[in-house]
Amino acid sequence: MFKRLLLLQFLIAGGLSLVFLLPKTPPLQPSAVSMEMPNVLVLSGWTAGPKIDPSKKEVEALSKDTEFSRRNYYRSAGMDAPLGSREMMQASIVLSGKDLNNSVHRPERCLPAQGLNLISSSDLPVKLRDGRTITLKRLKCAGNDNTGKNPYTHLNYYWFVGHDSIKHTHYGRTIKDMRDRLVQGYDQRWAYITVSSNLVRARMEDETGQEYLSVQLSEEETDRNVMELVAELAPEIIDLKKVKSLE
């Protein structure tokens, strides 16, 4: 009887010791992005409005440890535009928490849920100030206002920033995430960065309540604006010294 009790204690102790051999949860590495967007982009002439809170739907749809940063950037339209006209682009950062699947959703699926119809997808290379180039995914969508009588074109540009890399596709980010988990032994937070613009001429109101006339730009003009803005914005919000690969 004594031997049986001793054997049982030995088996229990041995079983409990196996807990220490179980694989540990991989450490969570930070993204190379900063959530603080600059107030002014001097070289390209953009000035940011006040910080914009995430919508109730965004907060409810994403995990609680997801972080948000969003601002509208404005600048005066060209000399040929009506007095007081402005160009506007919205920049947004969504930083994933521990549960990546419930923090960063595939943009091609999110936009249709917002009432936008995806028309086409392409790549837009942007040359940064240090000479390196990052690639943005460019989505062209068709939208309409609340009345359904005023269609417009919506352009959305996005990319992802991980611990040491930049990706411009959902699949590229997923493969990099899996590789780092298996080979490097860590999980990482990913930042989903977007710059977007509605190609519409309309009377608008900014965050301070001031009215202005939004200039309707062409797709080519909007692409140039995005390239100028991102070329200056990206080095301000991304620690490029930590980034080993750009795509």
Segments the model singles out, each with a brief description of its role:
Residues 24-43:
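Alpha-helical transmembrane signal-anchor/signal-peptide segments
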Residues 44-48:
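Short conserved aromatic/hydrophobic patches within beta-strands of well-structured domains
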Residues 38-39, 65, 185:
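Generic detector of ordered secondary-structure context
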Residues 4-17, 23, 124-247:
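A short, solvent-exposed beta-edge/loop patch
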Residues 52-181:
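Short, solvent-exposed recognition patches
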Residues 20-24, 35, 104, 122:
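Compositionally biased, intrinsically disordered/low-complexity regions enriched for serine, proline
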Residues 8-12, 32, 50:
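N-terminal secretory-pathway/extracellular module detecting exported/lumenal segments
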